[in-house]
Structure formats: structure tokens, C-alpha cells
A protein has these predicted regions:
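Aromatic-lined, polymer-binding surfaces characteristic
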Residues: 38-42, 46-59, 80-230
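Boundary at the C-terminal end of the N-terminal hydrophobic targeting segment
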Residues: 20-23
Length: 230
């Protein structure tokens, strides 16, 4: 199951039911989005292990296979592997951050891993909830991404793929973000302009909905909802 798509639909539902609430309707929408984002969609540990393997440990080029990795709570062994590969400088030692290929673009794995770890960090039911090692990794990972500015020859990564993962990560750790961390992230997410057609239109609407949740912009969230259902 596509966790981000489910979270998007949950946000739309909460938006329609919370519009008349005087106590910050976007707080409810935002929390609903995070609650659904951090869920694991694997029925048991065996399925989780299979999902991770089938996704080639987050390296799959196929969008559906990649979603297997980000839709579960990573097994403890995989979490420890990622912690072990992570350099104090904010990057993973097995990723080529200078890669610019159109398809299996290596730097995207950086955000895929951060998203998967943020799920565990933000979920109160996870054994890794609030873990200092993961928390430090997430902030260092953001700083490295902002400074390195990886880029692909494929427009999709810059306008859709990167903003999609980054926005979800920022929402899951929103309460811990510094002003500069949020501002730099928003500059990247703003590359997602409304438009295009088909699934790309839906993805762009989702990215703008997340941007609205990050900035408390109810008008933008409503516009994204209208783009989604229009």
C-alpha cells in the first residue's frame, strides 16, 4: 500500500470534517497525516522482511517496489545496518551523491532511508521512537542534502520525487526543526508547482498539501485538495 497516498486521503477527509473547528483545523489534519505516515502496512514480521528484500533494500527503481520499503517499520537489523553505514558528515557511505542518471538515481536513496527511519522515530509505538541516534541522523542528513544539492537529469526527481519524500520527513519531525531547516526544505518543496496531468498532477497536489501543512497555509491545503479531486 502507498503510505503517502493513504496519508493524503486521510488529510483530505480530516480537512473536510475539521473546517468549522475553531481550534486550529490544520493541527488535526497534520496529525492525521503523520499518524498514517508512520504506520506499518505489513501484517507481520515475515512480510516486513520480504517487503524489504523485494525493494532491494530501498534501491528498487520501480516505484511500487520502492514503496514496499517505505510502507513498513524497518526490522532492527536493517536499522542497525543503516546506522552503521551513516557517516558523521551526514551521508551514507554506499551512495554516489554525484550520480545524475535519469532512472535509478542513487541520491534518492538518501531520502528513502531518512523517510523509513523517520517513521520509526516519530511513531510512539516503535521501539526506536525518539531514539537519539536516529534523531541525530535525521538532522545531519537534512544538513548534508541541503549543502550537497544532489540533482538528476530527470525533471521528475527535482519537481516530484525529492519534494515528496522531503516534505513527509519534515512533517514527521516538524516539532524538532530549526527555522533554517524548515526554510531550506520549503525552498526545495516549492519546486512542486501545480500542473501537469495524470499521476504527476496527483503527486504535485500531494506535495503542495504537505507544504501547506508545514506552513499552516489552509488556503494552500484546500487548493491541493481541489486539485486532487478536480
Amino acid at each position: 500500500m502507498n503510505g503517502l497516498r493513504t496519508a493524503f486521503l486521510a488529510a483530505l477527509l480530516f480537512l473536510t470534517t475539521a473546517r468549522a473547528c475553531p481550534a486550529g483545523p490544520l493541527d488535526r489534519v497534520r496529525q492525521a497525516f503523520v499518524d498514517v505516515s508512520v504506520m506499518s502496512y505489513a501484517p507481520d514480521g515475515e512480510a516486513t522482511e520480504r517487503f524489504v528484500r523485494y525493494s532491494d533494500y530501498g534501491r528498487a527503481n520501480d516505484v511500487l517496489l520502492l514503496q514496499l520499503y517505505t510502507s513498513v517499520h524497518l526490522p532492527d537489523g536493517e536499522v542497525r545496518r543503516l546506522l552503521g553505514l551513516f557517516d558523521a558528515g551526514g551521508f551514507w557511505s554506499d551512495i554516489d551523491y554525484d550520480d545524475r542518471t535519469r532512472g535509478r538515481w542513487q541520491p534518492s536513496l538518501h531520502l528513502t532511508r531518512m523517510y523509513a527511519l523517520a517513521k520509526l522515530y516519530a511513531d510512539p509505538a516503535s521501539a526506536w521512537h525518539g531514539d537519539g541516534r536516529i534523531g541525530g541522523l535525521l538532522h545531519k542528513g537534512l544538513a548534508y542534502w541541503y549543502a550537497k544539492k544532489p540533482s538528476s537529469l530527470n525533471w521528475w526527481h527535482g519537481e516530484i520525487g525529492v519534494p515528496k519524500k522531503l516534505a513527509a520527513i519534515l512533517l514527521m519531525i516538524r516539532g524538532e526543526l530549526s527555522g533554517p531547516e524548515l526554510e531550506q526544505g520549503l525552498r526545495i518543496i516549492e519546486r512542486s508547482r501545480f500542473g501537469r496531468t495524470g499521476q504527476n498532477k496527483v503527486w504535485l497536489a500531494g506535495n503542495n498539501l504537505m507544504r501547506g501543512l508545514l506552513t499552516d497555509d489552509e488556503a494552500l491545503v484546500a487548493q491541493a485538495r481541489d486539485q486532487k479531486i478536480g
